[in-house]
Every structure is written in C-alpha cells, then in structure tokens.
C-alpha cells in the first residue's frame, strides 16, 4: 500500500482510481465517464487491428473491408465492434452532456472541465465523419462529397479550400489517404484530451445531484464506485454484444454495402444517425454560409452555457421552470434527429426550421430568461422575509 501511494506513476493511479474522494450521493448518471473510457479503449484497439488490413485506395478500400470481413480471422467481429461501439460512444456522450446540462455541471468551478468536454465532442464528430468515409461505399463517397463541399461556403477561398482538402478536383485517392491518416491519428489526440478532462475533474472533484459543493460526506473511489461503474460497464458490454452478434448493421446504412460510384447519386444522402440533428440544422437554413455557421455554432454554443445560465442555483433539480424547459430541449433534439433523416420536402423543412429556431432560442433566450425570473423571485421573497422579520423585531 505504501508503494501505491509513493510511487510517481502508481501514486497517480491511486489518487485518481482508488483514494479519490467522491460525493456519496452521486447516481448512475455519473457513470458515463467510465463507460466512455471503455468505449475509447475498444475503439483504439479495434481501430489499430483494422488498420493492419485496410488499404486507403479508391480501387481497394471497399475490397479491403470485404477482405477483413471474409478472410481475416475474426475480422467481422473487429469491424462490427468498431462500428457499433462508435454508436454507443455517441449515445453515452449525449447522455453525459444531457446530465451536465440538467445538473449544471458547466457552472464555476468546473468551466474548464466543461470546455474541454465540448472540444472532445467536436473532435469526436470529426473523427466519426472521417471514419464513415473509409469503407468507400456509396454513402461514404457522397457523404464525403457533400460535407467537404460545405467548406466552399467560406467567402473568397471556399472552392480552393475544398480542392485543397480533396487533394484534387473531386474525392479521390489523396482524399481517402489523408482521411485514413487523420482518422488513425486523431483518436490519440482525443485520448490526450480525455486525460486533460480527467485532470480538470480532479482539480475540484465531481459534482453531485444536489448541486452543492463541499468536502464532507465523501467516499473513496475504490471499492464503492469501481464496482458501481462495473455494473454499467457489464450492462453496456451485454447491449453491445446484442448488436454485434444479432443486428450488427442496425445503426448503419445499407447503401454503404454498394461500392462507391461517382456516376450514380444515392436516393438520399444522410450521415450516421448521431450526426443527424446537426445535419438537420444545416439543411434548415436556405443560405449555405449561414447554414454551415449555424451547424458549427450549434455545438460551440455549449461553450457559452457558464455565461448564459444566469441562475444562482446550480442544476435544474430544484427549478421547475428550468426542468420543464430542459425536457422541451431534449424533445427538440430528437425532432431534429428525425428531420435530419428525412427528405428535404414539406412538412419536414418547416418542422426542421422551427426546431432549429427553438434549439438556439433555448440557449440564447430561454435559459437566461428563466435564470433572471428565478433570481428576481428569490430577491422579492428575501426582501419580504427581511421586512417581516424587522416588523416582528
């Protein structure tokens, strides 16, 4: 035990995973960190093994993926683990962010922790998009063409910048090579950001469902929370196994089993399900440039939450108005996800525009307004209480 505390590396592990004091009342909503860590480890390991057999070439990419599936020992398992864990990764990230928004985890003193988390989200989406292109099926090619073409909205240099990203005049061998290179590199950057996220968390410790700060009533991470985390990790592995072994393509797109053909456009070009809400925001605005800016701002606006939430109370658990508005925001997010998967036609265009307007209004109008209303009501109540106390005295 003494070595565990004094050794420079083991001591670090001890302070994070064994002796770290955690609030005794944190619920299962605080388990997503460990689940995301497991997802990241699975993704890096399976990704490295897939890269050993993958060929980043427009002629051989699709064939090399089929080779992995048919000829490599347990190649099908590695690929399906990689594809389905990516979906679970995003499910857990969205739940993690939702918990952060509900319980006010972005408020001081955890603003740095929140900011690093938002950067991780943006990087995850970039990595997911790069990976979606690599099998080089129909959705891969046309998804890459559509999304990279968004850069052409940049004034003056847009088209030149798109061709710079492509390495030619269309999606070609150079594009696939650089996408593969970046898709291999960026998860390690993501792992470094995850380490920074943990460092920032360790500075002030975890928040808790009550939203109060304090060093009393805490428990060591091990054994209490290691075993609590193991419960959700095993449930996740069971759910992942169900998808991998029984319905491995449920969260994918069947068009990606058709080899990429630049001469034939698919009936509908849609990204993976976890990018659909932001794709819906992009499509809801007629102006290309404003649509692209709105799509990026829909993610980056999360960075503003510590400023936009004007309430003196951390979290929504004791704030009925905020709690109601939070669930309307969740409903709006799911509506956007549905709209992103539909064709660009009435009434989906109108519903998407309304949902996009509410998405931004929630951050810029609803959250600040509710905070101001609550603060005002508290001030009035406090003033009345003080005046009645003075009358009694």
Curated annotation (Swiss-Prot):
One of its GO terms (biological process) is mitochondrial electron transport, ubiquinol to cytochrome c. Heme b b566 binds at residues 96, 197. InterPro entries: Cyt_b/b6_C (IPR005798), Cyt_b/b6_C_sf (IPR036150), Cyt_b/b6_N (IPR005797), Cytb/b6-like_sf (IPR027387), Cytochrome_b (IPR030689), Cytochrome_b_C_euk/bac (IPR048260), Cytochrome_b_N_euk/bac (IPR048259), Di-haem_cyt_TM (IPR016174). GO terms for cellular component: membrane; mitochondrial inner membrane; respiratory chain complex III. Its cofactor is heme b. Heme b b562 binds at residues 82, 183. A ubiquinone binds at residue 202. The keyword Transit peptide does not apply. It is a multi-pass membrane protein. One of its GO terms (molecular function) is ubiquinol-cytochrome-c reductase activity. Binds 2 heme b groups non-covalently. Keywords: Electron transport, Heme, Iron, Membrane, Metal-binding, Mitochondrion, Mitochondrion inner membrane, Respiratory chain, Transmembrane, Transmembrane helix, Transport, Ubiquinone. It holds the Pfam family Cytochrom_B_C. The chain crosses the membrane at residues 32-52, 76-98, 113-133, 179-199, 225-245, 289-309, 321-341, 348-368. Heme 1 (or BL or b562) is low-potential and absorbs at about 562 nm, and heme 2 (or BH or b566) is high-potential and absorbs at about 566 nm. Belongs to the cytochrome b family. Component of the ubiquinol-cytochrome c reductase complex (complex III or cytochrome b-c1 complex) that is part of the mitochondrial respiratory chain. The b-c1 complex mediates electron transfer from ubiquinol to cytochrome c. Contributes to the generation of a proton gradient across the mitochondrial membrane that is then used for ATP synthesis. This is Cytochrome b. It comes from Mycosarcoma maydis. The gene is COB.
């Amino acid at each position: 035990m003494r070595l565990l505390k004094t050794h420079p590396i083991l001591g670090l592990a001890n302070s994070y995973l064994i002796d770290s004091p955690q609030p005794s009342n944190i619920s299962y909503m605080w388990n997503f960190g460990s689940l995301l860590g497991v997802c990241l480890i699975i993704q890096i390991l399976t990704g490295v093994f897939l890269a050993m057999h993958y060929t980043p070439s427009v002629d051989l990419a699709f064939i090399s993926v089929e080779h992995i599936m048919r000829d490599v020992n347990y190649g099908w398992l590695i690929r399906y683990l990689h594809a389905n864990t990516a979906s679970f990764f995003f499910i857990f990230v969205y739940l993690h962010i939702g918990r952060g928004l509900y319980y006010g985890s972005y408020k001081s003193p955890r603003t740095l922790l929140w900011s690093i988390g938002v950067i991780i989200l943006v990087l995850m989406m970039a990595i997911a998009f790069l990976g979606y292109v690599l099998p080089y099926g129909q959705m891969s090619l046309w998804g890459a063409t559509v999304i990279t073409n968004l850069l052409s909205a940049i004034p003056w240099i847009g088209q030149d910048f798109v061709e710079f990203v492509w390495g030619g005049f269309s999606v070609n061998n150079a594009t696939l090579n650089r996408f593969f290179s970046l898709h291999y590199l960026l998860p390690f950057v993501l792992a470094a950001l995850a380490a920074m996220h943990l460092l920032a968390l360790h500075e002030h410790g975890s928040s808790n469902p009550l939203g109060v700060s304090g060093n009393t009533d805490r428990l060591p991470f091990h054994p209490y929370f290691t075993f609590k985390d193991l419960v959700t990790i095993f449930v996740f592995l069971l759910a992942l196994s169900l998808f991998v072994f029984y319905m491995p393509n449920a969260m994918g797109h069947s068009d990606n089993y058709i080899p990429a053909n630049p001469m034939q456009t698919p009936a509908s070009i849609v990204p993976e399900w976890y990018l659909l809400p932001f794709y819906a925001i992009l499509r809801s605005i007629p102006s290309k440039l404003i649509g692209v800016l709105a799509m990026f701002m829909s993610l980056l606006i999360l960075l503003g939450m510590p400023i936009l939430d004007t309430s003196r109370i951390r979290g929504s658990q004791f704030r009925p108005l905020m709690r109601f508005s939070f669930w309307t925001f969740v409903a709006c997010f799911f509506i956007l996800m549905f709209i992103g998967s539909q064709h660009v036609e009435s009434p989906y265009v109108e519903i998407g525009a309304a949902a996009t307007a509410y998405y931004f209004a929630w951050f810029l109008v609803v959250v600040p307004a509710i905070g101001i209303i609550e603060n005002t009501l508290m001030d009035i109540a406090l003033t009345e209480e003080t005046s009645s106390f003075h009358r009694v005295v």
